[in-house]
Regions:
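Short amphipathic alpha-helical signal-transduction/dimerization elements
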Residues: 18, 181, 257-261
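Short, surface-exposed loop or secondary-structure junction motifs
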Residues: 41-220, 225
Length: 262
């Protein structure tokens, strides 16, 4: 499962809609979901950068949600909008962005993703959560005194539209980030607009540092880490089905980078 690494796919589709003049970074959330408190102050930029003032944990529905609109409504019914435009990481921002994509295009999230990213890049091993991926995906494990299967919550995954309901492989993910870097998906100016953030060092699914960027995705027993060291011209992807902490995962992938550089 791609987990939060999926956020950059959602952000890329938002930028594509901006390039088509169907949205702007200043478009207000109230245009699509006016019932959300302070939505008249929350912009697309705020949602992309987690500065919307929205807070939400990861509540799991009792049964799998079967369509995009039900996932968005689940988030709307469980989020809290505070009006404080400070950085606060929450999946709710990207679920709302995914919902905006469906409203602007009048298509499902997966249809837009397939048309604009999966098919052009030939990402044949990337798919949404459904019965086929459930049966074919790598299982996750807990390691203690005994090795046990991790109890995967498909109900939770079904609620994470745009931020945690995709499966992929390291090779497919590499094709995606490489396409961003070589401007196959977005022009230089569009990518610069999407990734511009000077306050939080986070924008559109990636954390930025002096010589590169990284992304982390931990969900449902899957642990995914991406590290792009531009000074060494190295992309590193680590996808695990066994638990490690966020800091351990980043340390592991940085150590891989050191080995490559040596």
């Amino acid at each position: 499962m791609l987990a939060s690494l999926q956020k950059s796919y959602t952000a890329t589709m938002i930028q594509m809609l901006i390039d088509q003049k169907k949205l702007s970074m200043n478009t207000k959330l109230s245009q699509f979901y006016p019932s959300i408190r302070y939505s008249n102050k929350i912009t697309i930029r705020n949602l992309l950068d987690h500065t919307s003032g929205i807070q939400m944990g990861e509540p799991a529905p009792k049964t799998m949600l079967t369509n995009d609109s039900s996932a968005v409504m689940w988030a709307i019914n469980h989020l809290k909008s505070t009006g404080r435009m400070q950085w606060n990481y929450t999946n709710a921002n990207y679920i709302l962005l995914a919902g905006i994509i469906t409203k602007v295009t009048n298509q499902s999230y997966m249809s837009v993703l397939s048309e604009n990213i999966l098919k052009p890049l030939k990402l044949r091993n990337t798919a949404e959560l459904d019965s086929n991926t459930i049966n074919s995906a790598a299982k996750t494990y807990n390691f203690g005194n005994n090795v046990t299967l991790h109890a995967m919550s498909y109900d939770l995954a079904s609620s994470e539209l745009g931020c945690g309901n995709l499966y992929t492989t390291p090779s497919d993910y590499l094709k995606f980030v490489s396409a961003l870097e070589d401007n196959s998906l977005l022009s230089i100016s569009s990518l610069n607009e999407l990734s511009r953030n000077h306050e939080t060092a986070y924008s559109a699914g990636f954390y930025y540092f002096s010589n590169g960027q990284r992304a982390d995705g931990i969900d449902n027993g899957y642990y995914n880490f991406y590290y792009d060291d531009k000074s060494e011209h190295a992309n590193m992807i680590l996808m695990l089905n066994k638990g490690v902490s966020d800091s351990q995962g980043r340390a592991m992938i940085q150590e891989l980078g050191n080995i490559i550089a040596s």
